[in-house]
Regions:
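Residue-level signal for secondary-structure boundary elements
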Residues: 2, 32, 64, 144, ...
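Cysteine/selenocysteine-centered motifs that mediate thiol-based redox chemistry or coordinate metal-sulfur cofactors
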Residues: 135-157
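N-terminal localization/anchoring segments of enzymes in phospholipid and broader phosphate metabolism
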Residues: 1-19
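Primarily the HKD phosphodiesterase
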Residues: 16-81
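HKD (HxKxxxxD) catalytic microenvironment of the phospholipase D
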Residues: 84-132, 140
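Internal, well-ordered alpha-helical segments in soluble enzyme and binding-protein domains
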Residues: 16-19, 132-136
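Short His-Asn-centered micro-motif
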Residues: 11, 33-36, 65-68, 89-90, ...
């Protein structure tokens, strides 16, 4: 990780998972994420689903967007089962973002998610700048409005 005055550059999937975990743990109201489906498997493996469940048990809300396809049905079903609101965007890949309580965020440049592993190199940016979080949330909300509910998509498989 490289520390910068206004944020931190994240250089590995391992560090990105740690940062995302910290954002979820510190959130009190809402977490919103837009993530390629292969990253959901890694996130679950490293207990992000459990941390999300704790937030929801405390009254928080989690909304997420991914591309639902057969290899990732179980990962999405688990998120829906624990209470996350998940929507589908066909053929989504590339960047990821996670925003907690409209102030902390991590976002990436393009990621080749199918080939990703814990030690893979990435370029992502963490910041606690609320203006940047609002910018990311504006993108999230636009995609959210166009996305299809996961329950509907899951019922088609």
């Amino acid at each position: 990780m490289l520390l910068m005055e206004s944020g931190t550059i994240i250089e590995s999937v391992r560090d990105a998972i740690a940062v995302a975990s910290g954002i979820i743990e510190s959130a009190e109201q809402e977490v919103a994420w837009l993530v390629p489906a292969p990253l959901l498997v890694i996130a679950a493996r490293y207990n992000l689903n459990e941390k999300s469940k704790v937030l929801m048990q405390r009254g928080g809300r989690i909304r997420g967007i991914t591309s639902i396809s057969p290899p990732y049905l179980n990962a999405v079903r688990e998120l829906v089962h624990i209470g996350e609101e998940v929507r589908n965007v066909q053929d989504y890949s590339g960047e990821f973002m996670l925003v907690g309580d409209r102030n902390q965020s991590i976002s990436s440049m393009s990621v080749v998610a199918e080939d990703i592993a814990l030690d893979s190199k990435i370029v992502a940016f963490w910041t606690d700048n609320p203006d940047y979080a609002e910018y990311l949330l504006s993108i999230f909300e636009t995609v959210w409005q166009e996305a299809t509910g996961a329950r509907k998509v899951l019922s088609e498989f």
